[in-house]
C-alpha cells in the first residue's frame, strides 16, 4: 500500500497526520501527487517555466477538498515543470531533513499561499487580477526552496498574512462590482419537498451558473447555500 503524510488540515488522524488515507477521502496517491505538484510549482517559479495563472491554479488545486483527481494533478505537473520525475519531486517535497520549527513555518507560509491563490482564482474568473499578489506567490515559492533563519520565516509569515488580506479585498471588489453589495434577505427555514443541492464556499460565478441552470430548466431541485 502506498504511504502518505498529509497534515495540512485540522481533520488529520490522531491530530498528527493522515498516513494511509485522508480523513477527507484523499488517497495516498493523490496526496503524494499534490506534494509533487507543489515542488514542481516551486521549480517553475525559479526557472520561469509556468505562468502566474498556472501557479495559482496549482496551489488552489491542492487545498483540502478542492481536487482529488490524480489525472488532473499529473496533467498540472506536466504543464508546470518537467525537469524532474514525479517520484523525485515527491521525495523532495517531504522536507525530511529540516528543523521542525523551520519546517512548520515553511508549511504555514505555504498554506497561506494556497488560501491566497484560492481567492485570486475566484477573482480572476470575474476578470480581476493584481500583479503584486501574483508576483508575491512566485517569489515566495522560490524563497521556500532555500534555507533561511527562523526570524526570516516569521517575517515572511507576517507578509503572507498581509498579502492574504489584499487578496480578500480583491475578491470582495470583484464580487461587489459584478453582483452588487450583499443584502440581508429573508429566506424560508421550512423543510422542502424536493431534493436539494447544498453549496458551500465563495465561488459566486459558479453559483450563479448553477442558479441559472436550475431556474431556466425547471429542474426538480432546490439550491441551498451555506458559507
Predicted regions and their residues:
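Histidine-anchored nucleotide/phosphate-binding helix
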Residues: 206-214
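Core alpha-helical transmembrane segments of integral membrane proteins
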Residues: 196-201, 209
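Short acidic loop-to-helix transition motifs that present clustered carboxylates
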Residues: 182, 204-205
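Conserved small/polar residues in nucleotide/adenosyl-binding loops
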Residues: 215-222
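Long, compositionally biased, glycine/small-hydrophobic-enriched stretches that function as flexible linkers
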Residues: 2-181, 186-194, 198
Amino acid at each position: 500500500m502506498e504511504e502518505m503524510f498529509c497534515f495540512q488540515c485540522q481533520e488529520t488522524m490522531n491530530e498528527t497526520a493522515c498516513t494511509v488515507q485522508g480523513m477527507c477521502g484523499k488517497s495516498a496517491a493523490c496526496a503524494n501527487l499534490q506534494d509533487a505538484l507543489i515542488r514542481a510549482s516551486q521549480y517553475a517559479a525559479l526557472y520561469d517555466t509556468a505562468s502566474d495563472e498556472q501557479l495559482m491554479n496549482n496551489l488552489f488545486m491542492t487545498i483540502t477538498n478542492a481536487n482529488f483527481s490524480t489525472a488532473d494533478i499529473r496533467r498540472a505537473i506536466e504543464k508546470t515543470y518537467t525537469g524532474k520525475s514525479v517520484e523525485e519531486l515527491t521525495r523532495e517535497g517531504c522536507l525530511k531533513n529540516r528543523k521542525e520549527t523551520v519546517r512548520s513555518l515553511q508549511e504555514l507560509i505555504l498554506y497561506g499561499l494556497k488560501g491566497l491563490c484560492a481567492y485570486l482564482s475566484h477573482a480572476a474568473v470575474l476578470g480581476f487580477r493584481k500583479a503584486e499578489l501574483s508576483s508575491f506567490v512566485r517569489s515566495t515559492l522560490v524563497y521556500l526552496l532555500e534555507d533561511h533563519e527562523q526570524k526570516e520565516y516569521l517575517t515572511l509569515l507576517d507578509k503572507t498574512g498581509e498579502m492574504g488580506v489584499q487578496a480578500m479585498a480583491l475578491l470582495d471588489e470583484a464580487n461587489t462590482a459584478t453582483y452588487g453589495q450583499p443584502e440581508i434577505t429573508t429566506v424560508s427555514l421550512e423543510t422542502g419537498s424536493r431534493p436539494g443541492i447544498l453549496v458551500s464556499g465563495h465561488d459566486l460565478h459558479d453559483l450563479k451558473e448553477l442558479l441559472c441552470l436550475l431556474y431556466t430548466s425547471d429542474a426538480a431541485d432546490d439550491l441551498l447555500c451555506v458559507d
